[in-house]
Amino acid sequence: MSTPARRRLMRDFKRLQEDPPAGVSGAPSENNIMVWNAVIFGPEGTPFEDGTFKLTIEFTEEYPNKPPTVRFVSKMFHPNVYADGSICLDILQNRWSPTYDVSSILTSIQSLLDEPNPNSPANSQAAQLYQENKREYEKRVSAIVEQSWRDC
């Protein structure tokens, strides 16, 4: 069944294949275009560098008018990521726009890894360490980067 949301997701997938952004990838799951599996590679020059982080993206039939639900499947230690892997990012909530596509969602999350917003913490411990003890924060991030290799 072809719906506007499904047609849009096919376009998003085609665009992602034809013009893949650096450091991110994503594709619909085998039997459901409404559920995607994605990977974000830790940005170079950040504590997340060399990490391989898996995510799931779940769309509704209201996409692109409503944002998808995006969660890290890989363990994540970040000020803006909840314990269940869900992400506190304005474009996935109140600043969503139908002009955003899968590519822009993934690159925005990749940018968030490097530039957390400690004023809107989903993980207060990570936010506190990020602001007050960068060395310990980076140590904790290194541990999840190493764990991401085992999870691949």
Swiss-Prot record:
Effect on the protein of changing N80S: Abolished ability to transfer ubiquitin to UBR4
Which InterPro entries does its entry note?
A: Ub_conjugating_enzyme, UBQ-conjugat_E2_core, UBQ-conjugating_AS, UBQ-conjugating_enzyme/RWD
Q: Which controlled-vocabulary keywords does the entry list?
A: ATP-binding, Chromatin regulator, Disease variant, DNA damage, DNA repair, Endosome, Intellectual disability, Lysosome, Nucleotide-binding, Phosphoprotein, Transferase, Ubl conjugation pathway
Pathway assignment: Protein modification; protein ubiquitination
**Residue ranges constituting the UBC core domain according to the UniProt record:** 4-150
The UniProt record lists the EC number as 2.3.2.23
**Active-site residues per Swiss-Prot or TrEMBL entry:** C88 (glycyl thioester intermediate)
Q: Which domain of life is it from?
A: Eukaryota
How is this chain modified after translation? Phosphorylation at Ser-120 by CDK9 increases activity towards histone H2B.
Classification via PROSITE patterns: UBC_1, UBC_2
Mitochondrion found in the keyword field? no
What reaction is this protein's catalytic activity?
A: S-ubiquitinyl-[E1 ubiquitin-activating enzyme]-L-cysteine + [E2 ubiquitin-conjugating enzyme]-L-cysteine = [E1 ubiquitin-activating enzyme]-L-cysteine + S-ubiquitinyl-[E2 ubiquitin-conjugating enzyme]-L-cysteine
Effect of substituting S120A: Abolished ability to transfer ubiquitin to UBR4
Q: Which residues carry this modification: Phosphoserine?
A: S120
Q: Name the associated disease, please.
A: Intellectual developmental disorder, X-linked, syndromic, Nascimento-type: A disorder characterized by significantly below average general intellectual functioning associated with impairments in adaptive behavior and manifested during the developmental period. MRXSN features include dysmorphic facies, hirsutism, skin and nails abnormalities, obesity, speech anomalies and seizures.
> Assembly and partners?
Interacts with RAD18 and WAC. Interacts with RFPL4A and CCNB1.
Record-stated family: Belongs to the ubiquitin-conjugating enzyme family.
Q: What's this protein's name?
A: Ubiquitin-conjugating enzyme E2 A
**Annotated source species:** Homo sapiens (Human)
Question: In the UniProt record, what gene is named as encoding this protein?
Answer: UBE2A
